Amino acid sequence: MNAVVVDTSVWIDFFAGRATERLDDALRLGTVVLPPIVVAEILSGIRTSDRPAMIAFLGDLELAEAPFSHWIAVGELRSAMSARGIAVSTPDAHVAQCALDRDALLLSHDSVFGRIAKATSLRLARG
C-alpha cells in the first residue's frame, strides 16, 4: 500500500471507536501521512488531560512536509477550484495537496474532497 493521507473527519471516527478499516490497515502497514493542519485540528478538539498521549501517538506518524512549493500549489488549487465555482478552505486545500504531492490516497468523509477529486487527480476513499 502506498502512502495514505488521513483527513480529520476519519480521525474523529477512529478516536470515537467507529469502523475505519482503511485507516486501520494503513496504521498497521505504517503508510499513514499526517498533514500538519490535521495535527492542529485534532489537538484543538481534545481534553487537555488527553493531550500528552495524543501528541505521543501523532508524533509516531509521518508528518507531511510542507515546503514553500507546497503552499504555492495549495494556492493554485484553491484558485483553480474557485474558477470552477467550488469554494475550498485553505486547510482543506492543504490536506488535498498533501495527497496530490505524493500521489497518495486521501481518506476523508468530507464532501469537498469529492469535488476536488472530480477536478484533479486526487485519489479519494472513505476511512
Residue ranges and their predicted role:
Residues V6-D7, L34-P35, A87-S89, D110, ...:
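Histidine- and aromatic-rich ligand-binding microenvironments
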Residues E21, L63-L107:
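Active-site neighborhoods of divalent-metal-dependent phosphate/nucleic-acid chemistry enzymes
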